[in-house]
């Protein structure tokens, strides 16, 4: 693993001590690969994943930031269908910049509170 990857995992473990999702306020976690972006709402008290959204279904040729924005809209819409309005944001060790920020901003604009 690269030094950058090890740094992210170290930050992720440090942050996870303080971030905990419940059924009323689940944890919105983000995973970013080179091509795709994934997000899920997790209830840490039971270990269940409540909602999943990813960029795998988006086939348009647009920028990665626009794809992340659409994924944020998608996860917020799915959360509303389940009845979730408030979440705890877990950036998973990534910097709050670029695609991670776009996903978070889109989820906020669609009505999720965090």
UniProtKB/Swiss-Prot annotation:
Listed name of the protein: Large ribosomal subunit protein uL18
GO molecular function: 5S rRNA binding; structural constituent of ribosome
Record NCBIfam families: L18_bact
Key word RNA-binding present: yes
Pfam families attached to this UniProt entry: Ribosomal_L18p (PF00861)
Family per similarity comment: Belongs to the universal ribosomal protein uL18 family.
Function, in words: This is one of the proteins that bind and probably mediate the attachment of the 5S RNA into the large ribosomal subunit, where it forms part of the central protuberance.
An individual GO BP term: translation
Keyword line: Ribonucleoprotein, Ribosomal protein, RNA-binding, rRNA-binding
Subunit structure: Part of the 50S ribosomal subunit; part of the 5S rRNA/L5/L18/L25 subcomplex. Contacts the 5S and 23S rRNAs.
Cellular component GO terms held in the UniProt record: cytosolic large ribosomal subunit
């Amino acid at each position: 693993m690269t030094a950058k990857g090890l740094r992210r995992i170290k930050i992720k473990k440090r942050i996870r001590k303080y971030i905990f999702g419940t059924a009323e306020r689940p944890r919105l976690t983000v995973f970013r690969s080179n091509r795709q972006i994934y997000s899920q709402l997790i209830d840490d008290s039971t270990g269940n994943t409540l909602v999943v959204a990813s960029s795998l279904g988006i086939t348009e040729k647009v920028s990665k930031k626009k794809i992340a924005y659409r994924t944020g809209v998608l996860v917020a819409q799915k959360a509303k269908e389940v009845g979730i309005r408030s979440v705890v944001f877990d950036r998973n060790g990534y910097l709050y910049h670029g695609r991670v920020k776009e996903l978070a901003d889109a989820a906020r604009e669609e009505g999720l509170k965090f």
